[in-house]
From Swiss-Prot:
Entry's Gene Ontology molecular function annotations: sequence-specific DNA binding
InterPro entries: AsnC-type_HTH_dom (IPR000485), Dimeric_a/b-barrel (IPR011008), Tscrpt_reg_AsnC-like (IPR019888), WH-like_DNA-bd_sf (IPR036388), WH_DNA-bd_sf (IPR036390)
Top-level taxon: Archaea
GO cellular component: cytosol
Domain HTH asnC-type: 6-66
One BP term from GO: response to amino acid
Originating organism: Pyrococcus horikoshii (strain ATCC 700860 / DSM 12428 / JCM 9974 / NBRC 100139 / OT-3)
DNA-binding residues (ranges): 25-44
Name of protein: Uncharacterized HTH-type transcriptional regulator PH1055
UniProt KW keywords: DNA-binding, Transcription, Transcription regulation
Length: 159
């Protein structure tokens, strides 16, 4: 994938939106020295190009939900279409909150949640058991979220 360059102003907009995704274009403009319309154009352009996604980040630990990260090793001889089918199922599952392709001993990292440990276990089993492409997996139970999607959870350090 080709590396894309962002301007200094684009990075400033992104930095402010990471701190407060609801910040108005006018407020961003005041802080970085651009007009409201210039900020709006840049923000919309970043969103249209797929570089910027504004979304909510659910804090499972704050809600009392149980969550885990599942490391999955894909069988080396698995046909590409089987792997894509598995990844699509992960992406469509309502209990997955993060999915990454990773390098190392495992190929995929999946964030999964449930209301309690029993539901979490069921959700993980539904994702993994019976998948022909899965060679092995490892579950890491989440204890506390300190940072997610580049946003530090400073209050998590207080406990």
């Amino acid at each position: 994938m080709k590396k894309r360059k962002l301007s200094k102003k684009d990075w400033e907009i992104i930095k402010l939106l990471k701190k407060d995704a609801r910040m108005s274009d006018a407020e961003i403009g005041r802080r970085i020295g651009l007009s409201k319309s210039a900020v709006r154009w840049r923000r919309i352009n970043l969103q249209k190009r797929g570089y910027l996604l504004i979304s909510a980040y659910l804090r499972f630990d704050k809600l009392g939900y149980t969550y885990a990260f599942v490391l999955v090793k894909i069988k080396p001889d698995t046909p590409r279409n089987e792997i894509l089918k598995f990844k699509k199922a992960l992406m469509e599952n309502e209990h997955t909150f993060e999915i990454y392709e990773v390098l190392g001993d495992y190929n995929v990292l999946i964030g999964v949640f449930g209301e309690d440990v029993s539901e979490l276990k069921r959700n993980i089993q539904e994702l993994i058991i019976g998948q022909k492409c899965v060679q092995e997996y490892k579950v890491l139970l989440g204890a506390k979220s300190l940072k997610g999607l580049e946003v530090p959870f400073w209050d998590a350090l207080e406990d």
